[in-house]
A protein has these predicted regions:
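Short, structured segments at the rim of ligand-binding sites
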Residues: 1-400
Length: 400
């Protein structure tokens, strides 16, 4: 969200800003570009003003280690007519992360894209033009990049097969607060009437449903009673039903959520014969793919068998082999599907996490449910999404 405000030169105040590493990296980029940045860590309030920014494509390259840096291209293109992006923009190691959908969007709005010394130079001599575009896949970042370009372009643009995740909806509401004209928020078709200057203002972020779910799952796998405040129950109907597949009931009341189990975790048997209980992850409103690892952790600990299907990424399940070090029985059907055979006795182990945020958390979840000392190596990605993960765990009584 911090990136989106570069389309305005008016002051902005953002509330509820998470203290995560990606935010700090983005703010460092802003400072390099000459923006005024004030972050109050105690109140999680961020003040930004981009009135005196500067950009030189020959010296300013957007960082390749953050996938979100690709969303700096539209604001830079709109304000300076040029941006330079590494052609191997990374993120979590989930498999091939395509940039072609973004290139298609930049080109459709009138941008020219060319390779230059290991990077992509995106430039536009003329103002961006309104377009109609159809995504071949409902990508979150591609959807947001389209909206950023469309807001800057003169005229009415339309996107079909838009992503509609809660954070995409919040992003659109943020743009509307700044003065953007967007219809279809929360649907697969967005209409943006652009060209008007954007203003400043105040905006408060809602709590991340991924983090809420993570702590509910931690309570469920350990048998603890964890209450998460400032919850967002409107995002949870399908997540709640998925918890129920493992014998966990989720209660939402008065702004908080709690996961409850009356006995050991147990995979619920489907009414359909000859099929496994399954969790299918795909673009929203399907089950969120980012949450699949923590439910695989529940599946390992639960009695019974379950199928987990990642319909998006081709390299996001390779880590499940690490679970065997705990004594878990997990079968990889193909790059997109694994089956957990739960109920095996589990023992402490030393495991290694790939660079995937919630895989590190999933491995921790399994370890936390086993008596004894385990070690999760390469767990630093957790800080990219959970600013006070260890501190919160200790407040719940965990020895970390």
């Amino acid at each position: 969200m911090c990136i989106r405000d570069r389309l305005t030169d008016q002051p902005l105040r953002l509330h509820g800003v998470p203290d995560i590493t990606d935010v700090r990296k983005i703010l460092d980029i802003f400072r390099t570009l000459g923006s005024e940045v004030q972050l109050d860590e105690a109140t999680r309030t961020l003040q930004l003003h981009h009135r005196d920014t500067r950009f030189d494509a020959s010296s300013h390259r957007l960082p390749e280690e953050m996938r979100s840096s690709i969303m700096l291209v539209p604001p830079l293109l709109a304000r300076f007519g040029v941006a330079r992006l590494e052609d191997n923009v990374k993120g979590c190691t989930l498999g091939v992360r395509e940039i072609d959908p973004h290139v298609d969007i930049f080109r459709s709005f009138g941008g020219e894209v060319e390779r230059a010394s290991g990077s992509l130079l995106i430039h536009s001599a003329a103002p961006l033009k309104a377009v109609r575009h159809w995504l071949d896949y409902a990508s979150v970042t591609a959807t947001e990049n389209f909206v950023l370009c469309a807001v800057a372009a003169q005229g009415e643009s339309m996107l079909t097969n838009a992503a509609c995740e809660p954070h995409v909806q919040e992003f659109c509401r943020f743009m509307v607060m700044m003065g953007a004209d967007i219809d279809g928020i929360g649907t697969s078709r967005l209409t943006v009437r652009g060209g008007a200057p954007l203003g400043g203002g105040d905006f408060t972020f809602e709590e991340d449903f991924h983090e809420i779910t993570t702590f509910l799952a931690l309570g469920a796998i350990t048998g603890g009673d964890v209450e998460v405040r400032n919850s967002t129950p409107d995002n949870f109907p399908l997540i709640d039903r998925t918890f129920a597949k493992f014998g966990v009931q989720v209660e939402h009341k008065n702004g908080w959520s709690r996961a409850l189990r009356s006995g050991p975790l147990k995979v619920q048997t489907p009414f359909t014969s000859n099929v496994l209980t399954k969790v299918e992850a795909a673009p929203w409103p399907y089950f969120p793919v980012d949450l699949l690892p923590i439910f695989i952790a529940l599946g390992v600990h639960a009695q019974g068998n379950a199928l987990f299907w990642n319909k998006i990424y081709d390299g996001a399940l390779g880590w499940t082999g690490e679970l065997s070090k705990f004594g878990a029985h997990v079968f990889s059907s193909d790059p997109h599907r694994v089956v957990t055979f739960g109920g095996n006795p589990l023992t402490p182990a030393v495991v290694e996490s790939p660079y995937i945020i919630r895989v590190a958390i999933a491995l921790f979840m399994v370890a936390s449910s086993i008596e004894g000392r385990s070690e999760i190596r390469n767990a630093t990605p957790i800080r990219r999404a959970h600013p006070h993960f260890v501190e919160n765990l200790r407040s719940l009584g965990a020895r970390v």
